[in-house]
A protein has these predicted regions:
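A short SAM/SAH-binding and catalytic strip from SAM-dependent methyltransferases
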Residues: 187-201
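A short glycine-rich, Lys/Arg-flanked "PGG" loop and its adjoining helix->strand segment in the class I
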Residues: 203-215
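Class I (Rossmann-like) S-adenosyl-L-methionine-dependent methyltransferase catalytic domain
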Residues: 92-118, 124, 129-168, 172-180, ...
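Ligand-binding loop in jelly-roll beta-barrel domains
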Residues: 70-93
Length: 286
């Protein structure tokens, strides 16, 4: 449990209030661990196979070690004593915390992949939205500035940050102005943002990102492409062409670059997530 954090505690249950669904076969969600806390009485707890057969039975009380239920593990409370008092607590990995607790979209996978190699320092989340990347990085100890044009999104970010006791600089900002405030940053992050800008401002926006990156600092960009083999199905104001993003970073150390297929959370008329190529770049300034 060292790498897990609690994101939700259920109310105290008694024999009368123990929810019926927990007495039937069910499983935890993807990325969710669960643990019972027993204050009084005892519970017969069954781990189940997918076909409903019992794989293990344990008798739990206030003094016995309580097993952690793994994600998607089938189980049920088979029996509870009349004097039972207990509650359930849910855990997740740190990168899933804000998604689980506040309903956020998960921290972008490229941010998660890049973070271990980037030292703590000043981070600019350019086009932060509600802060799925900002909050995660701030929780790890980065000094985060979040800029976005959408004021309601920034307000939600500030509210969640306040609830979590996180300190972030949050300001409204029009990225197309290409006039980043706040001096130099050690890491500038822009995930799924640039395709919402007009094509004519892209060179200035990228140059502005680069000029506000400290020596030895990093830029991470993920943005939509439209290619011959995979025309973008969304009418974004801008999409990168093959090799275009990479050309902007001539002279930088390219730590990662690809034009792989990816998906939006947005779906088509059949409920399938929209799939096309994204330009993904992680580069270090010399």
């Amino acid at each position: 449990m060292n790498n897990l954090i609690s994101y939700k505690k259920m109310p105290l249950w008694t024999a009368e209030t123990l929810p019926e669904p927990f007495k039937k076969m069910h499983n935890t969600k993807v990325g969710t661990w669960a643990q019972l806390h027993i204050l009084k009485g005892e519970i017969t707890f069954e781990f189940l196979n997918e076909d409903g057969s019992v794989s293990d039975t344990v008798l739990l009380n206030a003094t016995t070690p309580i097993p952690l239920v793994e994600p998607q593990q089938w189980h049920r409370i088979a029996k509870a004593s009349d004097d039972i008092e207990c509650y359930l607590e849910f855990f997740c990995k740190k990168e899933d915390y804000f998604a689980k607790k506040y309903g956020y979209t998960k921290t972008h996978s490229e941010v998660l992949a890049a973070q271990p190699m980037i030292p703590k320092g000043r981070v600019l989340d350019l086009g932060s939205g509600e802060g799925r990347n900002s909050l995660y990085l701030a929780s790890l100890g980065y000094d985060v500035t979040s800029l976005d044009w959408n004021v309601p999104s920034l307000q939600k970010l500030q509210e969640v940050a306040a609830q979590e006791g996180l300190s972030l600089e949050v300001d409204p900002y029009d990225i197309e102005c290409a006039d980043i405030p706040g001096g130099q940053y050690d890491w500038i992050v822009s995930t799924v943002v640039l395709m919402f800008l007009h094509e004519e401002v892209i060179p200035d926006v990228i140059e502005n990102m680069q000029s506000h990156t400290a020596s030895g600092g990093y830029n991470l960009i993920v943005a939509a492409m439209s290619t011959e083999d995979a025309p973008c199905p969304v009418n974004f104001p801008f999409t990168f062409k093959e090799g275009e993003l990479l050309e902007y970073y001539a002279g930088w150390e390219i730590l990662k670059y690809n034009e792989d297929f990816g998906e939006l959370h947005k779906t088509d008329e059949n409920g399938n997530r929209l799939r096309f190529r994204f330009a993904t770049l992680l580069a270090k300034k010399g």
